[in-house]
From Swiss-Prot:
Source organism: Mycoplasma pneumoniae (strain ATCC 29342 / M129 / Subtype 1) (Mycoplasmoides pneumoniae)
InterPro entries documented for this protein: MFS_dom, MFS_trans_sf
Keyword Chloroplast included in the entry's annotation: no
Residues spanning the membrane: 28-48, 59-79, 88-108, 128-148, 176-196
One example GO MF annotation: transmembrane transporter activity
Intracellular or extracellular location(s): Cell membrane
Disulfide topology: none
Name of the protein in its database record: Uncharacterized protein MPN_113
Keyword match Transmembrane helix: yes
Domain of life: Bacteria
Entry keywords, A to Z: Cell membrane, Membrane, Transmembrane, Transmembrane helix
Amino acid sequence: MNVYQTIANFGTNILESLGLEAALSPTLSNTYIYGIPVLGAIFSGLITKKLTKSTAKSLIVQALFVILGTLAFLVITLASPAKPETGAFNQATLWIAFVVICFIMFFIGANRSIFWSTITELKVNKEIVGLAVGFISIIGFSKDVWLSPLLTGTTNQFIVKNSQGTSFYSQQALVAWAIFALINACLALLVTYMIVRKVKYGKVWVNPKFKKVFALGEQQYGH
């Protein structure tokens, strides 16, 4: 998921551009990259077992929360800096942004912990499971190759220096990251929705209104 890579790769830059002291960056980055997703994974396993009873259903609910988080992040980045001469936002905005980032990473960790289980629900032929996993991995992890150079090249033009000579990313870069994350969160929801339909109806785009008609036809004509 590109939302994860955006926050994992640029989360420190985002928070420091919002006014975070460099000394706190390692602690906070380890918290939202490694600590929070583990909690999300535990949460995802529990709700899948106790509530949704379906990996696909859990994924779509959690994907909606990721979208909610990225929307909140976009709103935060659109707020005007409290101190334009330094580029720093006020402390309240900084810590709200950190909480939102943790919220996003919580549900990303939740999704990443169970998404391979959809292979079972999709009833992928056991003979091609290895091939399917490999193909999915090529597509899914290829972003690690191109994402950082793409976003870095796009946002480096927005690097500025404050009156103390410290470099930080301007508001335009923060908004660009937020929009990119939101777009990818929406795409993730679309893919998850397709998985849910495939699990439920056997086909991605079958209109559920015709499902009963097809079932009656199969019973009547034996097809």
